[in-house]
């Protein structure tokens, strides 16, 4: 199938609720579950990862980044995917105003240690990079790019639209973002 980025910009909803973009938990949270050696490989073949996992185990990191053998790099790439998806969804909902009037992701914080999910804060209080991506997407004034997809290959033209999103009550001077 396609990417959520492609599907979302084709939809027109009055609100986007209970969505998410999965990402691995922080290394601190993962170490509360087991030693890194026990978590490898962090996929559906690992009993510990499955017992403490959610749909984040189905992240298509290999599709986007190739085969990753380094544990820290795998976590980083999985979290990057979550950042991109979460930020894109929040920005896309803002681009669809005034028709779309609400955007609310499924899970702000996670109440138990797991290998990954949609949360922005993982158990017990470890902030994931996606939290900051969503915070950036929710700034009052934002230059926002609507790119067509996440993956571009050599020779493809990157195609995107640029929006100036202004939810402040102030008129912005020319040239200020």
State each model region's role.
Residues 2-175:
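Substrate-binding clefts and catalytic carboxylate motifs of secreted carbohydrate-active enzymes
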């Amino acid at each position: 199938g396609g990417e959520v980025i492609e599907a979302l910009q084709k939809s027109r909803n009055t609100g986007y609720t209970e969505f998410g973009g999965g990402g691995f938990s922080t290394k601190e949270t993962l170490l509360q579950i087991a030693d890194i050696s026990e978590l490898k490989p962090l996929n559906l073949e690992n009993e510990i990862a499955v017992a403490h996992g959610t749909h984040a185990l189905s992240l298509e990191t290999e599709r986007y980044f190739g085969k990753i053998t380094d544990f820290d790099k795998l976590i980083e790439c999985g979290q990057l995917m979550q950042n991109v998806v979460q930020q894109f969804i929040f920005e896309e909902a803002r681009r669809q105003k005034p028709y779309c009037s609400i955007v609310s992701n499924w899970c702000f914080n996670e109440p138990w240690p797991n290998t990954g999910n949609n949360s922005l804060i993982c158990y017990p209080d470890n902030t994931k990079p996606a939290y900051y991506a969503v915070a950036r997407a929710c700034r009052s004034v934002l230059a926002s790019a609507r790119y067509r997809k996440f993956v571009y290959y050599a020779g493809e033209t990157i195609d995107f639209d640029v929006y100036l999103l202004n939810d402040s009550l102030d008129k912005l001077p020319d040239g200020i973002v």
